Amino acid sequence: MRKILQRLLSKLFIVSTIIIIQMIWWFFLFYTASVASRVFQDLLYVAAILLSIYIVNRRMKMYIKMSWIFLILSVPIVGIPCYFFFGRPELTSKTQKRMARIVEAYAPLRPENELLNETLRLTDMDAYRQSRLITQNQKYPLYAEDCTEYFKSGEEAFESILKDLRSAEKFIFMEYFIIGSGVMLDQILDILKEKVKHGVVVRIIYDDFGSINAIPPHFIKEMESIGIQTRRFNPYKPMLSVIMNDRDHRKILVVDGRVAHTGGYNIADEYINKKIRFGYWKDAGIRVEGECVNSFTTMFLEMWNYINKDNAVHDEYLNPHNTFSQSEESGFVQPFCDSPLEHDDVGENLYVSIISRAKKYVYIFTPYLILGTELSHAMISAARSGIDVRIVVPKIPDKKLIYLQTKANFRPLIEAGVRIYLYTPGFIHSKCIVADDDTAIVGTCNLDFRSMYWNFEDFVYMYRTQCIGKIKEDAIETFAVSEEVYEESTNDISFAGRLLQSILQLFAPLL
C-alpha cells in the first residue's frame, strides 16, 4: 500500500497525469467541435490533407511520414493534435538556433588532422568514408588511438571508473541519462566530495525524465551544498511540448581532459548487478585516453552551456593538441554525438555503412531491435550476400510492448539469413557493433527509433584499435550463453499477438 501511495504521489505520476488530461482535453475539444459543426468537420479533413502534403515534403524518413499520414487521415481528431505535439523529432526553432550557436562556437576547438585523414584514406577507403561521414555532419575529427579499453560488464567498468575518479586533479564532468540512489552512486559521491575539498571542479548533468523515479527529490540542492555543480536536462513539466520528447541519453565521464568513459551503463545499481531486475544485467562500455578525450569534453561543455544559457567558450578544460604519444601501430578513434538538432541521422547512417561494407561478419548487441527501412535492408542484403550477421537481444525484456515490437522484426531478418540470439542469463543493455576484426562502435545508441531520431546520443567509432579483438571475443562468448531464434519459432504467435505486432509496427516510428 505504501509503495502504491508513493507512486501516486511521485512527480512522474502527477506530471504524466496532467499531460494526459491535457491530451484528452484537446481530443475532446476536436471531437465535440466536429460533432457540433459539419463545417468544422470538413475543415478538419481539409487540414488533415494539407498537413499530410506538408509532411510528404518534409525532411523525414518515408516510413515515418507514412505512419503519420495514416494516423492523420484516418483519425484527424487524434492525428492532427498528436503531430503538433509529438511529430517533430527536431528541437524547436528557438532551441535549435541557441544550441547551434554553442556547437559552432566549440567546433574550432576540435581541428582536423589532415595528415591522419590521409593516412586512413590510404589504409582503408571504406573506413575513411565512414570517418568523413562523421566529420562532415558532426564536426568531430578523427584521432590516432592512444589507449582504448573495452569493458564487457558494468561491474568491470565501475572498477575503472572509481580508479579514474580517484586520480582526478583538475576537473570531473559527468553526464548521464539516469542517476539513481544506491551503492554505485554512494561510492562515486564519496570520491567526489573529497575531490571538491581539494579544489577539483565537479559538474554533473542528468536527464530529468530518465532519473525522475531514481534520484532523490532534492538531489540538486544536496549536490550544490557540497560544492558539486549539478544541472538537469529538459525538466519534465506538466505541459504538452515538442521538446519534452527529446532526452539526453548520453553517458559521459571525463576526468582532467585525459581520460573518458562511455557506454550503456548509467549511475544506478542495476548496471553493476547490485540490484537484480531482469536476471543478470549485461552491459558494455569503453574507456579512452589521449587527444580524443577533447571531443567528449566539448560534448559535455556544449550541453552545460546550453542548460546554463552560457555562450562563452571554456577552452581552459581542453588539453593542448599533439601532446599525447602515438605509436605507428595505433589505430584510429573518433568519438562523436548525434542529436535531434540535425536531420542527417549520423548514427543510423554509420551503422548502415558498416553493415553494407562488411566483408566477413557483423556482430551487434542491442536491447531493442526496432528498425527503419535502411537498417533492415542493410542487414538483409548483407546476410543474403554471405556475410555472417548476428544480433543479440534480451531474453528477459524490461518493456513488454517494446519487446513485442523487437520480436516483430525477427522473421524477415531470419528468413534472409541473419542469426538472432536471445541473451538467456537476463537482460543485455550493451550497444555495440563489431565487423571484420577492424571496425567497431561502442556507445549509448539503441537500434530503435527513439535513439536514432529523438535522443541525444554519443558513440566511439574505432578502426583497428587495441580493444576490437576484445569486443569480438565478448560477442563470441555471448553467443555461447544465448539461445538462437529459428524461423519455426517465429510462427508460434497467436492471432491476437500478430495483430498487436502489426499495429505496433505501423506506429513504431511514432513511439
Where are these regions (language model features)?
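Catalytic-core elements of nucleic-acid end-processing and repair enzymes
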Residues: 431
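Surface segments flanking catalytic/ligand-binding clefts of nucleic-acid enzymes
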Residues: 419
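Short glycine/threonine-rich loop-to-helix capping motif typified by GTGT followed
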Residues: 377, 403-407
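N-terminal localization/anchoring segments of enzymes in phospholipid and broader phosphate metabolism
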Residues: 1-349, 353, 357, 381, ...
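Helical hairpin unit composed of two closely spaced alpha helices linked by a short loop
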Residues: 368-389, 394, 399
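Glycine- and other small-residue-rich loops at beta-strand/loop junctions that grip anionic moieties
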Residues: 177, 367-368, 402
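Thr-Gly-centered strand-to-loop micro-motif
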Residues: 365-366, 423, 442-443
